[in-house]
């Protein structure tokens, strides 16, 4: 394994223990390099979010990890995430690996100002910090993400959707993790705000050197921000390549269909595709069950 690998996912499978069982993630193996943005693309229900939750061990019943290992390669040694106990896992999240959740801008506590919510991250994970140090850190974080330290006493309802999303990114950045998982971080934002958020993520990644797993069904968006892209379908990774090669030289028919499903501003209109790509008859297991 290369020295620049930060995260290794090996043969990871997740099953929803219902009747009949649903194989949400099937034998996924991926590597994330240090300082890299790895895009994870696929239609809704293909298993992207389930995979992200499995990495962070945030799955709730009836979801069960049935096989595989996830390892974070740190300077001071490897962390086998599967083997961490509850307290170790609680300390691991946000400190080593943080996550910006889908619909995160609506996850802020409406009756608490954003400064207090940011401070909670430090009081939980950095109990030795003084109140003045925490307040200074919170103000600096708000400046870094473009909200401004002067909004530290603002409540979520006083901020736009884009600003609330920036606050969530500030929380994810707070403890300077080496890994950040972003699950549809620009959902429900207009295209101009989306562009600003993407530009900011790129700048922050270069500034702080963290690695990103960026999850979305929007393949054109991933082509702009990602170094490499993994295409997911029916719970499996079917293709992984550089963003450039995914665009110019896709290997799988499904990848080609994903690319062609987005309209172009120029050129001829492509043929209409009948049916739903994720529910057709050519799935690996003959079924196209819904996955999160």
Regions found by a protein language model. Give the residues of each.
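Short, glycine/charged-rich "phosphate-handling" switch motifs in NTP-dependent
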Residues: 228, 240
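Conserved ABC ATPase "signature" region
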Residues: 73, 120, 132-150, 259-260
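A short, surface-exposed alpha-helical micro-motif characterized by mixed small hydrophobic
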Residues: 222-224
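Short catalytic/signature loops enriched in Gly
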Residues: 3-5, 145, 152, 242-292
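Conserved ABC ATPase signature
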Residues: 155-159, 163
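A short, proline-enriched helix->beta-strand linker immediately N-terminal to the Walker B motif
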Residues: 174-178
């Amino acid at each position: 394994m290369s020295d620049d690998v930060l995260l290794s996912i090996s043969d990871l499978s997740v099953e929803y223990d219902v009747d009949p069982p649903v194989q949400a993630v099937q034998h996924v193996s991926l590597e994330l390099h240090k300082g890299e943005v790895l895009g994870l693309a696929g239609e809704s229900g293909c298993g992207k979010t389930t995979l992200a939750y499995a990495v962070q061990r945030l799955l709730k019943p009836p979801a069960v990890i049935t096989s595989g290992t996830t390892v974070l390669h740190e300077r001071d040694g490897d962390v086998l995430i599967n083997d961490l106990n509850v307290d170790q896992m609680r300390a691991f999240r946000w400190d080593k690996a943080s996550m910006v959740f889908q619909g995160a801008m609506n996850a802020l506590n409406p009756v608490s100002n954003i400064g207090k919510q940011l401070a909670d991250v430090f009081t939980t994970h950095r109990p030795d910090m003084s109140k003045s140090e925490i307040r200074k850190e919170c103000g600096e974080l708000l400046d870094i993400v473009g909200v401004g330290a002067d909004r530290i006493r603002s409540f979520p309802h006083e901020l736009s959707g884009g600003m609330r999303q920036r606050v969530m990114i500030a929380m994810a950045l707070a403890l300077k993790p080496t890994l950040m998982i972003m699950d549809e971080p620009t959902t429900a934002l207009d295209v101009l705000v989306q562009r600003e958020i993407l530009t900011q993520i790129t700048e922050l990644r270069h500034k702080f050197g963290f690695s990103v797993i960026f999850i979305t069904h929007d393949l054109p968006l991933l082509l702009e921000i990602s170094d490499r892209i993994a295409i997911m379908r029916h719970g499996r990774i079917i293709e992984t390549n550089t963003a450039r090669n995914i665009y110019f030289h896709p290997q799988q028919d499904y990848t080609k269909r994903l690319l062609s499903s987005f309209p172009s501003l120029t050129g001829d209109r492509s043929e209409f595709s009948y049916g739903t790509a994720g529910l057709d008859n050519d799935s690996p297991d003959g079924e196209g069950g819904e996955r999160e």
